[in-house]
């Protein structure tokens, strides 16, 4: 165990532990905590085996160095171990934990775990002063140590695949678990369709339906059962079977039911997946397969999102602790709208307890309310999408002819957005029209009606089934488009795509005086891997591309480390460096080159020298990630040749241009969910504007976690005309975090040696 620092020259010591069920991304959090603490001049300690290690002390509390957390960001589980500790639930156990922290000189603690672990941390904070007095009284700790550490400062990080922790949009591990579930359900779907078979899939989540609900939304499941909203009638088995039977009647070849492990009926009785299977077999008179995914949801490498989430939260937690003043309450460090936020831990625990109380008393409306608006919206959307057939049109409700076009480079999630728009629109009584091959299809009148079943199976399909291209409209094109709109009686237009889609929509808006056919609701939904559109923090397709990059780079690293190589990896993004920066953070790259920051020869020379120095000290791998347009002169091959020549005899150099694999693949769960969410909101906006005498044009986006519509008129002023990227890019604020993680060692040590 560490010796406490001398009081007169006290160095802050930060401890980190992972507790409860493991979650992918915990290693990235540990790495961020350790490196941020060291970089700020503090000492870092890992408490092995969770809260139990805190009780046992001794070798369970170990000092960490910079290299102690090298090459762990891509690993699943937690390298410092975790455990559920029954002893910590006792006062005597917490007293031992307090003594061990005091004797190690640790009064700042980062706890990565679920609600049980965070509740335990809150209790330890509350009891600290009294336990301190008891330890002084029985001589377990010296008086000097007790005087130096009168308070315990705690930062909790939400680490749970269940995503059941209030105070954060999503917890560490939940996105990775969704990847496991959607991959499994996608695979099951292909065999189910081959045999025209029904499947029941049970997913984790305990008493939270997040994983079940979001995986149902992402996979296009036909029915879902979650704890927060049980079936509101007793004969739910017959209703579920009827919906699945109707789906087969209209042409579906398979049926998929997703069941949360905590599912219940409206009386609070558990609904097991085996009970669902038996009900389907009874009412459908067919053989039904049951798959319980189990711990495959918890294991494996973390997704790109979880790696970056954990890094951001771990860094923010240490920053908070090092600036904590006397009297600072324990805080949960979570994410809201892509920004780290802190919330008093006791408030988060109180909300979690309120949700549990609401569910135990069968107040499910209250439970849904406490889960948040995004959860409620997702549930309402799923209820529409699982229908075998749409509702009958409502009397008196205006019915519109809404055209949909995909434009720009292909982005995973385009098909998901189109599917959601078509089914939600038809369910509202509208007629949906598909325009083939992007804006060229508008010019050539390549329009056809889309039905409920036209988009069957599109939820998980990559690419763009309607066809897309990057064509920019010329002045002569508008008259042809006006003729198409008149011939097809187009009364609203939804454009799903990138820069060319936004340019087209803005052009149509400007042409309204000349062509009255364009005086209709115009809405753009951001879908591009480049994430270079205004009005939205993230575009559909970006998360999938980022995961494609991270998967490829993980493999490249395994190859490079065996041969002591420097790898220069080029990623897409045009003039926007989002993919480069976020993939660099997620893969642990040493350097990232962005067009926003520029690249010069002096920097490249410094990078060569730093790499050579590292390899001489037994470094095994150098990873450099560059945006494709970061510098036209110092391109990827130039950098490769430079590093190869200057590193001769010390390291080898190779380059990899990842290319169009970044655009391919089935959409990630995040892209599927956001595409569905945004498309649904677009349909609401279109109907609202369709009632106006002069309908507006807008582009939708997620900004700071909220869905917002921005007037199309603002599009040119929000874009840089030269680079065709937004003037404001929120993610650049994360560059210092990535750079601090990528250093060869802490700046505090470098400064001390000067």
List the model feature ranges, each with a label.
Residues 2-7, 54-109, 118, 161, ...:
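Glycine-rich oxoanion-binding loops at beta->alpha junctions
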Residues 2-58, 396-443:
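N-terminal phosphate-binding or glycine-rich loops at protein starts, especially the Walker A/P-loop
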Residues 13-21, 78-83, 107-113, 156, ...:
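Short glycine-rich or small-residue beta-strand-to-loop segments that form or flank ligand, phosphate
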Residues 19-22, 47-53, 84-85, 114-116, ...:
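Short, ordered loop/turn segments at secondary-structure junctions
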Residues 23-33, 54-55, 89-95, 115-122, ...:
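Short glycine/serine/threonine-rich phosphate/pyrophosphate-binding segments
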Residues 44, 111-113, 119-153, 171-290, ...:
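Accessory alpha-helical/coil subdomains and C-terminal extensions
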Residues 272-396, 640-754:
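C-terminal non-catalytic interaction/assembly regions of soluble proteins
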